[in-house]
């Protein structure tokens, strides 16, 4: 799976059950990633402009190919730096099981630009879940597509079966 356009999402994870609760809010923008892209600068969504001030960038190579690129664009301490790794874990949870079909996702840049935390109720699990759900929400709105596997094969058949085999291969979109 991958995406074909930029998208924005906010997600608030809030759980209260007596005692210390869970709270984490993440605001992010995702876009298709290509090697050599310039740093993100400004995004426009629904008439709103979002300026990015990239503090840190992580390029995470994925085992199945492609990359996840995470840009920390948070200003003013809206989210403590100690919660960024938890957000990245949440992103990886969804990359490993893409939001569309559960297949691996790849080649996505994520800019975390805002959020909220609570002095008592914020913890790593809250931000992991907030990051995971914000990513899933943004992914579904970013015109996702399923990547088809491509194989290079050589087929040897007797000449009397050539027509049947060619017909079958063309039915499977072979070239």
What are the residue ranges of the model-derived segments?
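Accessory interaction regions appended to the cores of large information-processing enzymes
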Residues: 1-175
């Amino acid at each position: 799976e991958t995406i074909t356009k930029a998208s924005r999402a906010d997600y608030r994870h809030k759980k209260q059950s007596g005692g210390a609760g869970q709270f984490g809010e993440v605001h992010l923008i995702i876009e298709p990633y290509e090697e050599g892209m310039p740093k993100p600068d400004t995004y426009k969504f629904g008439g709103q402009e979002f300026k990015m001030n990239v503090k840190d960038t992580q390029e995470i190579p994925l085992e199945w190919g492609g990359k996840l690129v995470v840009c920390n664009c948070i200003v003013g301490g809206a989210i403590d730096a100690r919660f960024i790794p938890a957000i990245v874990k949440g992103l990886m949870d969804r990359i490993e099981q893409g939001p569309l079909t559960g297949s691996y996702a790849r080649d996505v840049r994520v800019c975390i630009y805002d959020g909220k935390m609570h002095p008592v109720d914020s913890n790593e699990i809250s931000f992991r879940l907030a990051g995971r759900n914000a990513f899933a929400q943004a992914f579904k709105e970013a015109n996702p597509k399923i990547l088809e596997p491509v194989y290079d094969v050589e087929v040897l058949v007797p000449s009397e079966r050539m027509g049947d085999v060619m017909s079958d291969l063309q039915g499977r979109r072979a070239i």
